[in-house]
């Protein structure tokens, strides 16, 4: 049974989060009564308010008002006053993934999972389905530039969603098609062990119904191992691996564009198909890999090669995925969400491939627990940056862990062999270093899932101020 419209007012706690805001927006657009709260104002909050949704800043019991259902983001703890009030009122309390699952019951659904690349891959699948005139509903973990939002209604039969594995609730999503881009050591604070992470992704794939299929990246050893354990579902593999069903090859970089070919071999029919001279307006092999996952689905759903080619060429990207925020004296400045060592390594490799000069990475480590679990991996992921600037850790509500701070990370990266790693404290430090050290052709790349994005947005202006010999300041 689909969710009835007479369930009453739905209250979203933590509605400003990227996943929650998209779900709230879609429920509002479907005609449900929606309100919410968040601990801080944000662009997502303002976007929802612009649609007429009432949102309170700060978490207080009275925010619930006449709510009949309460939806919690994964970040909300049981000590939250709105959670406590909902329990006292005996209201239904629903996790974010459960509400997303309710939306998925309305459509045929594609769920994109993996420890990295989910947001970009989700956006690319949406772009190719758009190009094929499928007009999908989309709920993503990032702002899709073509839409200006992370949620889109769509009037077609298909829905594309990002499947967040961080708390295990992605196993509740009823997907007809499941994508797994990669499986790395992540969210160990929730799962407890990497074996539990592996098992969760196996279950994610096996949850696909017999009439659906999974799309798995054969370039990743853990995903290839997963593919070998799936014997009762239809699996399509992709990557550079010669054994993959859908291979991408002949890559060449041209600034912020990548040219490549795709070769498709159907295990069912034996038919072979070539898509040559594809152009993706993004740099990096990791982005071509994500695009190939999208191509696999589009091809299987019968979208023409011409539409696939057009959809890729016109792909507008995702906010905070190697997004250029400005330039100064020939120095290009970028903002990226990458915060796991695998993501950081991929972004810096792409920057190295396309930059004419040096690569300067400004990194804000995200969560003490992640740094603790992946300390050695962080030491080895910056090799493609000529200079690494480590900012204070963005704790995201976590308490510091002794011996695993920004200063210790700087020393650990140096011990691993990097020649130029520096500790910084504020944006003024970045302005000073870039203005005196960087040269035309260099890339300055901000990396992190926290508020370092504000630095990336502010840096071009702060550098421009120097040209006028004025003092600069940062709020």
Swiss-Prot record:
It catalyses: UDP-N-acetyl-alpha-D-muramate + L-alanine + ATP = UDP-N-acetyl-alpha-D-muramoyl-L-alanine + ADP + phosphate + H(+). One of its GO terms (biological process) is regulation of cell shape. InterPro entries: Mur-like_cat_sf, Mur_ligase_C, Mur_ligase_C_dom_sf, Mur_ligase_cen, Mur_ligase_N, MurCDEF_pg_biosynth, UDP-N-AcMur_Ala_ligase_MurC. The keyword Cell cycle applies. Coiled coil: none annotated. It is found in: Cytoplasm. GO terms for cellular component: cytoplasm. Its main location: cytoplasm. Gene3D superfamilies: Mur ligase, C-terminal domain, Mur-like, catalytic domain, NAD(P)-binding Rossmann-like Domain. Keywords: ATP-binding, Cell cycle, Cell division, Cell shape, Cell wall biogenesis/degradation, Cytoplasm, Ligase, Nucleotide-binding, Peptidoglycan synthesis. It comes from the Bacteria. It is an enzyme of class 6 (ligase). Its EC number is 6.3.2.8. GO terms for molecular function: ATP binding; UDP-N-acetylmuramate-L-alanine ligase activity. ATP binds at residues 114-120. The keyword Cytoplasm applies. Pathway: Cell wall biogenesis; peptidoglycan biosynthesis. It holds the Pfam family Mur_ligase_M. Belongs to the MurCDEF family. NCBIfam families: murC (TIGR01082). Cell wall formation. PANTHER family: UDP-N-ACETYLMURAMATE--L-ALANINE LIGASE, UDP-N-ACETYLMURAMATE--L-ALANINE LIGASE-RELATED. This is UDP-N-acetylmuramate--L-alanine ligase. The lineage of its organism: Bacteria, Pseudomonadati, Pseudomonadota, Alphaproteobacteria, Hyphomicrobiales. The gene is murC.
């Amino acid at each position: 049974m689909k969710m009835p419209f007479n369930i009453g007012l739905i209250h979203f706690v933590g509605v400003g989060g990227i996943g929650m805001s998209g779900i709230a927006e879609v429920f509002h657009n479907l005609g449900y009564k929606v309100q919410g709260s968040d601990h801080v104002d944000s662009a997502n909050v303002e976007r929802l308010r612009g649609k007429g949704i009432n949102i309170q800043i700060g978490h207080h019991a009275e925010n619930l008002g006449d709510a009949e259902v309460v939806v919690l983001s994964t970040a909300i703890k049981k000590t939250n006053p709105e959670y406590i009030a909902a329990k006292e009122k005996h209201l239904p309390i629903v996790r974010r993934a459960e509400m997303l699952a309710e939306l998925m019951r309305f459509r045929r659904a594609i769920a994109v999972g993996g420890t990295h690349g989910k947001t970009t891959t989700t956006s690319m699948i949406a772009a190719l389905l758009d190009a094929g005139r499928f007009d999908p509903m989309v709920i993503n973990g990032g702002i899709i530039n073509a839409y200006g939002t992370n949620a889109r209604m769509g009037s077609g039969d298909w829905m594309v969603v990002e499947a967040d594995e961080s708390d295990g609730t992605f196993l509740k999503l009823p997907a007809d098609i499941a994508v797994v881009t990669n499986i790395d050591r992540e969210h160990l604070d929730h799962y407890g062990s990497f074996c539990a992470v592996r098992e969760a992704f196996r279950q994610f794939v096996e949850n696909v119904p017999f009439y659906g299929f999974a799309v798995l990246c054969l370039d990743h050893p853990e995903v290839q191992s997963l593919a070998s354990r799936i014997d009762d579902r239809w699996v399509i593999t992709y990557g550079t691996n010669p054994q993959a069903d859908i291979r991408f090859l002949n890559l060449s970089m041209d600034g912020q564009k990548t040219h490549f070919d795709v070769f498709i071999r159907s295990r069912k029919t034996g038919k072979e198909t070539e898509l040559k001279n594809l152009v993706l307006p993004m740099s990096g092999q990791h982005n071509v890999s994500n695009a190939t996952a999208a191509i696999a689905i589009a091809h299987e759903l019968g979208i023409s090669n011409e539409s696939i080619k057009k959809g890729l060429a016109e792909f507008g990207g995702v906010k905070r995925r190697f997004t250029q925020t400005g330039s100064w004296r020939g120095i290009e400045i970028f903002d990226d969400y990458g915060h796991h060592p695998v993501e950081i390594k991929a972004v810096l490799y792409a920057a190295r491939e396309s930059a004419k000069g040096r690569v300067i990475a400004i990194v804000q480590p995200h969560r003490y627990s992640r740094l603790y679990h992946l300390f050695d991996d962080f030491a080895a992921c910056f090799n493609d940056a000529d200079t690494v600037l480590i900012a204070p850790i963005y704790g995201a509500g976590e308490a510091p862990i002794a011996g695993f701070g920004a200063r210790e990370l700087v020393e650990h990266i140096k011990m691993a062999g990097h020649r130029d790693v520096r500790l910084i404290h504020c944006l003024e430090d970045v302005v000073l270093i870039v203005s005196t050290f960087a040269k035309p052709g260099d890339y300055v790349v901000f990396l992190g899932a926290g508020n370092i994005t504000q630095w990336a947005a502010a840096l071009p202006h702060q550098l421009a101020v120097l040209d006028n010999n004025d003092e600069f300041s940062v709020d």
